[in-house]
A protein has these predicted regions:
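Short coil/turn segments at secondary-structure boundaries
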Residues: 101-108, 128-131
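Generic internal hydrophobic packing segments that stabilize the cores of diverse globular domains
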Residues: 84, 88, 107-118, 137
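Short acidic (Asp/Glu) patches
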Residues: 110-129, 153-164
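Acidic low-complexity segments
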Residues: 127-135, 141
Length: 210
């Protein structure tokens, strides 16, 4: 049985005991992030991960941009231009049961914003010994919209997203539960001083004994 097949009861139980989701507000936000390595176990699919509550996130929204004049790239009419609106990322931190704005980073390119995001990361390694294929220290993960192409290529969209539309949400993952696809074993990891992994491990042990 894989983590995908166990997902619903596992998420429900960890939510009930306050280790993920809305009930885990002491650890971080209610957002749930699952990184599934699909297919059979192989050198390309070694582990799946359920990320624990995050205490920091990056949110990027669509700024107000003047649409490009009508043209047809499919007919060879490709119009290159320099993006004049900077990409703005809002760093938010989880405090007192809510997300609060902490600071803002901005750049002319997506790569530039992601590079500046390194200043809000940490080099502290996870306790325990994660599988070779798994992260050894906290990392950023989440969703990026295709419309971010506005800051990766010299293009102006004819139909850009509405102003304020969310283009990117990245969570800083400082704790996670991983499934070794070759053995089916589950292991929880977190940084020093964080008992989240111990609590998850205890819940898993109790579940196996039942």
């Amino acid at each position: 049985m894989t983590i995908e097949e166990r997902l619903v009861p596992l998420l429900h139980h960890l939510n009930e005991v306050g280790l993920i989701g809305p009930n885990a507000f002491k650890f971080g936000g209610p957002d749930e992030l699952l990184l599934v390595s699909g297919g059979p176990a192989s050198h390309l699919a070694k582990a799946s991960m359920l990320c624990g509550p995050s205490r920091r996130r990056l949110v990027v929204r669509q700024p107000k941009i003047q649409p490009s004049a009508p043209h047809s790239p499919s007919k060879g009419d490709v119009r290159l231009t320099s993006q004049t609106s900077q990409l703005v990322g809002h760093i938010e931190e989880w405090k007192h049961g809510c997300w609060y704005h902490a600071t803002t980073i901005f750049d002319e390119t997506l790569a530039g914003v992601l590079e500046k995001l390194q200043a809000f990361s940490t080099q502290t390694e996870f306790e325990g010994t994660p599988l070779p294929a798994l992260p050894k220290r906290p990392f950023w993960s989440g969703c990026l919209a295709y419309d971010l192409v506005q800051w990766t290529q010299p293009l102006t969209l004819q139909h850009p997203p509405e102003e304020g539309t969310i283009l990117c949400v990245l969570f800083f993952v400082e704790r996670y539960l991983a499934e070794d696809k070759s053995t089916g074993e589950l292991h929880a990891f977190s940084i020093k001083g964080d008992d989240w992994s111990q609590r998850v491990g205890s819940e898993l042990s109790q579940a196996q004994e039942k």
